[in-house]
Curated annotation (Swiss-Prot):
The modification Phosphoserine is found at S241. One of its GO terms (cellular component) is cytoplasm. Keywords: Cytoplasm, Immunity, Inflammatory response, Innate immunity, Nucleus, Phosphoprotein, Ubl conjugation. Residues 32-109 form the Death domain. This is Myeloid differentiation primary response protein MyD88. Signal peptide: none annotated. Residues 156-290 form the TIR domain. Ubiquitinated; undergoes 'Lys-63'-linked polyubiquitination. OTUD4 specifically hydrolyzes 'Lys-63'-linked polyubiquitinated MYD88. Deubiquitinated by USP3 that cleaves 'Lys-63'-linked ubiquitin chains leading to inhibition of MYD88-induced NF-kappa-B signaling. Adapter protein involved in the Toll-like receptor and IL-1 receptor signaling pathway in the innate immune response. Acts via IRAK1, IRAK2, IRF7 and TRAF6, leading to NF-kappa-B activation, cytokine secretion and the inflammatory response. Increases IL-8 transcription. Involved in IL-18-mediated signaling pathway. Activates IRF1 resulting in its rapid migration into the nucleus to mediate an efficient induction of IFN-beta, NOS2/INOS, and IL12A genes. GO terms for molecular function: TIR domain binding; Toll-like receptor binding. It comes from the Eukaryota. Gene3D superfamilies: Death Domain, Fas (1.10.533.10), Toll/interleukin-1 receptor homology (TIR) domain (3.40.50.10140). It comes from Sus scrofa (Pig). The lineage of its organism: Eukaryota, Metazoa, Chordata, Craniata, Vertebrata. The gene is MYD88.
Length: 293
């Protein structure tokens, strides 16, 4: 992955690494990328050139210019779009002539990729062998919700996982009334109500979002932007459906915000409860989106 010397072509990553999602790159590598690409010079392509190669439009680039770390925001925005991968990022850097970045960060990127692949392999190895009487759910992940089968043979499933902050619980309760207790008869997964205590929150969220829930509703607010748990859940759901092709994630804005709407969700159609002109259609639109096959 790293070049062999000054001016040399960088060796391409192995196919398995090329296809890895951008989530494989840790914070340290992203920070060092910012140090290289945030600097505007006449002799080397910066983050704006990379954004153009990623097919960002002019207005999108202008918006990113207002961010304190535009490279980081660019990567966060891009990783949810179709075709985003570690391999593609390296190809674009090479195309822009940034061999200095590839030489300097190549070993670190390669190490991140190895760790990511190893983690995936370890998780796969930890899955027990299946027998006829056991469902595909992981046994240690059985009995995690109120109505779960403790033996794991009939895990509880939901129409949608609700990603929210505790401060937004009143709106979540209204969502329950509008979507569960009406003719829509949808089944929502609300952590404070449905999830049993005593298990790692990250493991439970991953299991529910990936295997138990067909969709995920993100209740976006100023407090949501400060929540590490919500950030993890959102990025995990996006990684399961890059580019939102499967309409898996639905952002909901239910009150005005002082902070900027999260860039990682800007490319997905929002269900806006704050717009008085469309408020009467809000629950119908949301219910219909959650009812899609």
């Amino acid at each position: 992955m790293a070049a062999g010397g000054s001016g040399a072509e960088s060796a391409p990553p192995t196919p398995s690494m090329s296809s890895l999602p951008l989530a494989a790159l840790n914070v340290r590598v992203r920070h060092r990328l910012s140090l290289f690409l945030n600097v505007r010079t006449q002799v080397a392509a910066d983050w704006t050139g990379l954004a153009e190669e990623m097919n960002f439009e002019y207005l999108e680039i202008r918006r990113l210019e207002t961010h304190p770390d535009p490279t980081r925001s660019l990567l966060d925005d891009w990783q949810g779009r179709p075709g985003a991968s570690v391999g593609r990022l390296l190809e674009l850097l090479a195309k822009l002539g940034r061999d200095d970045v590839l030489v300097e960060l190549g070993p670190s990127i390669e190490e991140d990729c190895r760790k990511y692949i190893l983690k995936q392999q370890q998780e796969a190895a930890e899955k027990p062998l299946q027998v006829d009487s056991v469902d595909s759910s992981i046994p240690w992940m059985s009995g995690i919700t109120i109505r779960d089968d403790p033996l794991g043979q009939m895990p509880e499933h939901f129409d949608a996982f609700i990603c929210y902050c505790p401060s937004d619980i009143q709106f979540v309760q209204e969502m329950i009334r509008q979507l569960e207790q009406t003719n829509y008869r949808l089944k929502l997964c609300v952590s404070d109500r449905d999830v049993l205590p005593g298990t790692c929150v990250w493991s439970i969220a991953s299991e529910l979002i990936e295997k138990r829930c067909r969709r995920m509703v993100v209740v976006v607010s100023d407090d949501y932007l400060q929540s590490k748990e919500c950030d993890f859940q959102t990025k995990f759901a996006l990684s399961l459906s890059p580019g939102a092709h499967q309409k898996r994630l639905i952002p909901v804005k239910y009150k005005s915000m002082k902070k900027e709407f999260p860039s990682i969700l800007r490319f997905i159609t929002v269900c806006d409860y704050t717009n008085p002109c469309t408020k009467s259609w809000f629950w119908t639109r949301l219910a219909r989106a959650l009812s899609l096959p």
